[in-house]
Amino acid sequence: MACRAIVFTDLDGTLLDSETYSFEAARPALKELKRRQVPVVLCTSKTRAETESVARKLGLKHPFIVENGGAIFIPPGYFTPEQLTSAGVRPKRRGNYVVLELGLPYQQLRRFLI
């Protein structure tokens, strides 16, 4: 079985310039990855809304990981229901996405920590 490439990248100071938040320097690499059909998965501490905005500007249509791994947002139709269930995944629907929530709700964490 051939190994297929996938790129996981942070945003701040990695894909985006740390001072200007520009991704112009990364644009040629992103274009080449798209040409080669290599998925680029954003992994960040940012929220869904922030990450979704960046993904849209970059033209990325792949899953993205937000809030330091708290959730994975998967575009509809990216994986079949069979692929998800065979992997033991029980996703929720949120807006246009299938979501895997990996963290605990804020109120539950707060009760535990305080």
Task: Show where each model-derived region lies.
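Active-site phosphate-binding/coordination module
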Residues: 27-114
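Short, small/polar residue-rich loop motifs at catalytic or cofactor-binding pockets
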Residues: 1-4, 59
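Asp-based phosphoryl-transfer active-site loop
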Residues: 4-20
